[in-house]
Structure formats: structure tokens, C-alpha cells
Amino acid sequence: MILQISPGSSWLIRGAAALILSLHITSAGVGILSGSLALLARKGSQLHRKAGNWFFVSMLTMSAIGAAVAPFLPDRISTVAAVLTFYLVATAWVTVRRNDGGAGPFGIGAAIVGVCIAVAGMMFGLQAANSATGVIEGQPAGAAFMFATVATLAAIGDLSTIVRRGVVGERRIARHLWRMCFALFIAAGSFFLGQQQVFPTFLRGSTLLFLPEIAVLGLMIFWLVRVRFTKWLERRAQHPDQSAREP
């Protein structure tokens, strides 16, 4: 994210812009590091919880700043990405923090937000696809369609939680897992692919910069399969001493 400030702006505006940009970059870095640590740590451990807390705060900070600033750049698709990230992290957090897993008024509000994100992403994606260059404001149509698809799936999950009056067991863990992981995927992509100018010249445009995003998606799929299609959660409940030695 680059803030364009007029050379004639007052020192107060320049200072505020520098502070906002520094906070955005710092929170993004903390989010990527803490999210990676939470993903690799033993699930349910103190390290996992502490890293998750840092991830929650830093990602909400980063995405809130992005959502507030991106419309003025202007960068509509990045605005969608920022709001989606905030939404995914917030709903994932509530899923494991509340007994109802996010049903009730919060779930209704979350579903509405998810639908709005999906509609906005689809609309901007169509605008980009129908443009002469296939992009709008430097962002490709495919990115907008991807965000719209993820928001649609998340909104469907919210509606399912409302209908079921909560989410428990494997569904609850899976809901928390994929939302946090995809938020981390967005953050990693924004940094490693969207800010290539901060890397050495030989790395710019390199496929190596795709590895962090691939790793996040790979670990997300691994854990989703392990949670939903094996008895991992049941074994952890039955043998807590043994599970303490497992990831």
C-alpha cells in the first residue's frame, strides 16, 4: 500500500500518513509471522493460543487500515480483499470463542457482510473482465472473482451455522481453521507478490515468492482433511496426554 500525499501537505498530515503506513506494514508482518507460528504449533497449546491472539489483533489492524485507505487510492479490489480478511478473521475468532459458534445476531450480521463482499467482488471482477486491459486499478479480474467465491462460501457457512443454531465438533474446528488460513493466505500474497519491490532484484517475478502462499494452502488442506475425515479430534479428546505430543 502506497499513500499519495501532496508535497504541500502539512507536517501533521504527513506524520499521520507515515504512522498509518508504518502501522499497516508492522501489523502485516506480525500477522504473517504469528499466523505461521499458530499454524505450525500444536493445536490448542499455549503457544498456539498466544500466536493466535497476536494474529487476531494484527490482522484486524492491518485489514481495517487497508479497507479504510484503499478506496482513496483508489483500489476497489484491494478494498474487497481487506474487508474479506477482516470478516474471515473476526468470524473465525468468534467461532472458537463463543459457545454458539457465531450463531445469533452476530451470525446474521456476518452473513450479510459476506454476501455484500461477494456482490462487490463479483461486480468489480466483471468490470475488470469487460475492460480493455482485463484489469481495474492494476488488479486483475481473477483476484476479484476469487475473493467473491471465498466470500460466498463463507456466507453459506454463516447461514448454515444460523440454521443449525451453532456449530460444534469437527465442523467448528474446520470453520475456524479455513477462515484463519485463508486470511493468512491473503496477507502472504499481498506481501510476497504485491510488494515485490522490497525484495532483491533476483527474486522479483520469481516463482519462489509463490512458495509461502502454496505452503499456507497446503497446510490448510492437510488440516481440513485431518479434522474432517479422520478421527484426530476424537483421539485428542480420548487421549489428551498422547495428543499433547502431536501437532
Could you tell me what each predicted segment is?
Residues 1-247:
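Alpha-helical membrane insertion/targeting regions
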